[in-house]
Amino acid sequence: MNFLAHLHLAHLAESSLSGNLLADFVRGNPEESFPPDVVAGIHMHRRIDVLTDNLPEVREAREWFRNETRRVAPITLDVMWDHFLSRHWSQLSPDFPLQEFTCYAREQVMTILPDSPPRFINLNNYLWSEQWLVRYRDMDFIQSVLNGMASRRPRLDALRDSWYDLDAHYDALETRFWQFYPRMMEQASRKAL
């Protein structure tokens, strides 16, 4: 899962959106650095990552990547799940339009920015002003996201080519998304994530 899915599931679980978004920028034990609600959100994010990576649908989807891109398949798929969530948001969350949700999420996250790591602050400078969560529905933007990640981290250069795997398996990936994401929404609503 990437930014949008983590925020969405956190909202459904009544967990800290801030903690769920911040988690990838925090190493080790967060208890000494953040308030309890943010810590709980960080832990929820980590549980979701482990759960998602081990779902049969996600394991199967990783196998569709070519040898030269399979190493980055988990990252690429995380971004792709956000694409499908953004694209189908009105079906999955009909009572909370994506643009409104984005504003709500931004307000929640802004409360912790002063005490956040610089890389997280930098992400937030772009995430909200450039409307990433809404733009995830556009596959050209997904390609741009993957290229940007590859540019910032040369060891992830294969992300550039992983775009072709997404394109080749788009329909099958969308089917897998519909198989697992509604289940995760239900688990989040029951606070079982």
Curated annotation (Swiss-Prot):
Gene Ontology annotations of biological process type: fatty acid biosynthetic process
Catalytic activity: holo-[ACP] + H2O = apo-[ACP] + (R)-4'-phosphopantetheine + H(+)
InterPro entries: ACP_PD (IPR007431), ACP_phosphodiesterase_gpbac (IPR023491)
A GO term, aspect molecular function: [acyl-carrier-protein] phosphodiesterase activity
Superkingdom classification of source: Bacteria
Keyword Lipid metabolism carried by entry: yes
Disulphide bridges, residue numbers: none
TM ranges: none
Swiss-Prot/TrEMBL keywords: Fatty acid biosynthesis, Fatty acid metabolism, Hydrolase, Lipid biosynthesis, Lipid metabolism
UniProt entry tagged with the keyword Hydrolase: yes
Family annotation (Pfam families): ACP_PD
Entry EC number(s): 3.1.4.14
Task of the protein: Converts holo-ACP to apo-ACP by hydrolytic cleavage of the phosphopantetheine prosthetic group from ACP.
UniProt record similarity statement: Belongs to the AcpH family.
NCBIfam families: PRK10045.1
HAMAP family linked: AcpH
The protein, known as: Acyl carrier protein phosphodiesterase
Name of encoding gene: acpH
